[in-house]
Regions:
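Short acidic/His/Gly/Ser-rich catalytic and metal-binding motifs that mark active-site loops
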Residues: 118-122, 168-182, 226-230, 271-275, ...
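Signal-peptide-cleavage-adjacent N-terminal segments of secreted and extracellular proteins
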Residues: 23-43
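Bacterial Sec-dependent N-terminal signal peptides
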Residues: 1-22
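Extracellular/periplasmic catalytic domains that process cell-envelope and extracellular macromolecules
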Residues: 63-67, 102-104, 153-155, 255-257, ...
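Structural recognition of the beta-strand scaffold that forms the well-ordered cores
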Residues: 68-76, 107-112, 117, 159-163, ...
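N-terminal catalytic cores of secreted or lumenal carbohydrate-active enzymes
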Residues: 36-216, 237, 247
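Aromatic/acidic polysaccharide-binding cleft in carbohydrate-active enzymes
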Residues: 320-372
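Active-site neighborhood of glycoside hydrolase catalytic domains
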Residues: 197-218, 225-331
């Protein structure tokens, strides 16, 4: 198997994990020529003058965002591959990844609500019509939940973000004018008649996970809401998300006493070049009632420029920003470290934090050598 996480590479170059003993800091180093490939070492901190000609001066009077964490997505594929490992090897890998004393101290992970495009099959937790038929499915029960429990045993305070790739198909219509049923995993829109049921679906999912001992820190209403083409997907423009959050999801979480955060959007900096969707979360914030239920917005970097993060923060500094997906693969020559290491370091590891993101989460923590 190939143990793969972009963030593992990104934090390796002169970056520190949460692991710290006495005055030593654990550092993982990767160089773009692979002379050092994820080499772990201990660096002693002291008050001696550094040999480096560069000096970093900290001004304690200037404050930026506090960090909630760094991590990766724990998808169905990730969990399936982890469960295929020998238990002792899996434990060693998870400790190396999530322990803040024996490893890197990953502190934030993302999981799908129902299937993602890296699941074993397409499904939701309510494929039989009627929200009373909600139930966790085999992927959660056999793979995702057992792995999450192992992670929580290593890192009890880890934060978990949930995102759906699609609503149940019986809630879909082909468009909001004709409202014709749309029985496809790909594309479609959420029928407004099912806003309340879908909000209940979120509540039931959060409660079901918590019943398994898995606390959910936050959710997004829809992964990549402007992407109609994913294997499991749902189009949800900003006006739809505004109405869904304001009239259903936000109130439903509040009335059930759940403190789960809601982050809007969860898609690209350039809003997939759709003119009418530009400034997506900011348009939702302009509605005071909808904004009251939103902690902030989430972004991916598959299109556009990270300067959009500064734009959003400048206009709505009271709303948080988190970064929830980036990936490498054949399509972007992602394994070519000589070409990509510093570019990815600048774009994802530094470009997000330096532009107000409180969390940085990359895509699949682990895949096999067939990229699945």
């Amino acid at each position: 198997m190939v143990l793969f996480s972009l963030l593992m590479v990104l934090i390796c170059l002169n970056a520190c994990s949460g692991a710290k003993t006495s005055d030593n800091v654990t550092v993982y180093v990767t160089t773009n020529d692979r002379a050092k490939d994820f080499v772990r070492s201990e660096i002693a901190l002291g008050d001696k003058q550094a040999a480096s000609p560069s000096v970093i001066t900290i001004d304690p009077s200037v404050r930026y965002q506090t960090m909630d964490g760094f991590g990766a997505a724990v998808t169905g594929s990730t969990c399936y591959n982890l469960m295929r490992m020998a238990p002792e090897d899996r434990t060693a890998f998870l400790k190396e990844t999530f322990s803040d004393t024996e490893g890197m101290g990953y502190s934030y992970i993302r999981i799908s609500i129902g299937c993602s495009d890296f699941s074993l099959s397409e499904y939701t937790c309510c494929d039989t019509k009627g929200v009373e038929n909600f139930a966790l499915q085999s992927e959660e029960k056999e793979y995702v939940i057992p792995i999450l429990k192992e992670i929580l045993a290593i890192s009890p305070s880890i934060k978990i973000l949930g995102s759906p790739w699609t609503c149940p198909r019986w809630m879909k219509v082909d468009n909001l004018k004709d409202l014709r049923p749309f029985e496809s995993w790909t594309s479609g829109q959420l029928n407004p008649a099912y806003y309340q049921d879908y909000a209940t679906y979120f509540v039931k999912w959060i409660q079901a996970m918590e019943a398994e001992g898995i606390p959910i820190e936050a959710i997004t209403p829809q992964n990549e809401p402007l992407n109609r083409g994913n294997s499991a997907s749902l189009f949800m423009g900003w006006e739809e998300q505004l109405s869904f959050v304001r009239d259903a999801l936000g109130p439903k979480l509040k009335e059930t006493g759940l403190k789960t955060k809601i982050y809007a959007f969860d898609h690209n900096y350039n809003y997939d070049n759709m003119l009418e969707q530009q400034g997506y979360p900011m348009k939702i914030y302009e509605d005071e009632n909808a904004a009251s239920f939103l902690t902030g917005a989430a972004y991916h970097n598959y299109g556009g420029d990270r300067e959009e993060l500064n734009n959003v923060n400048g206009k709505f500094p009271d709303k948080e920003l988190i970064f929830t997906e980036t990936s490498i693969g054949m399509w972007n020559d992602g394994r070519n470290l000589e070409k990509r290491l510093m570019e990815d370091m600048e774009e994802t590891a530094l470009g997000t934090v330096n532009n107000w993101c409180k969390a940085v989460i990359v895509w699949n923590l682990m895949l096999d050598n067939e990229r699945g």
